[in-house]
Amino acid sequence: LMKKFGRFEIIGETRDDAAGEAFDKAAKMLNLGYPGGPAIAKIAAKFKPTSYNLQATIYKLPRPMINSGDYDFSFSGLKTALLYQLQKMASKEIKEKTPALCAEFQQAAADGLVSKTIKAAQKFNAKTVLISGGVAANELLRQTLAEKLKKEAPKISFLSPAPKFCTDNAAMIGLAAFQKSRRKSAFKSWRALRAQANLRL
């Protein structure tokens, strides 16, 4: 939750795998390569459900913690459910049904992210929902969040950067450091700075 630029409060986070990590691991299970998000989205786009091939009734994956009552996420269970599903299938079937599996995995991940995000935005009277990071490049997530916000919370605006900016990069870290340096209480001298790989915002 950002009340003003550079001031954050964490109200929800993953309890295990990050969303992007779950996509990467799922793609590895399906032999789709890395990074997993774009690979799964590309194959999922090939799935066209029909009355004889209903996605929801063939490979229904769980939506972990979607009704947990808090704003945390979990993707480990979703990843494990996909693994168990693959273990029940022959190699030929996996190859034939990969688009359906990708579509369901992608939808399950998006459902969890969208549901928790909207609930949090409503609870804390957010004016705007902004998505960022690698998973924010996922078109299904962007579209689903935009549509559900418009339907369930029409007064909350939605912002999403162009997909090419939805990556980890030095520029965003540099900007964060620059803004922090402008606050005199942040640090006294750059010489006293120490690298911390797990530094929180």
Residue positions per predicted region:
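Acidic, glycine-enriched active-site microenvironments
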Residues: 1-201
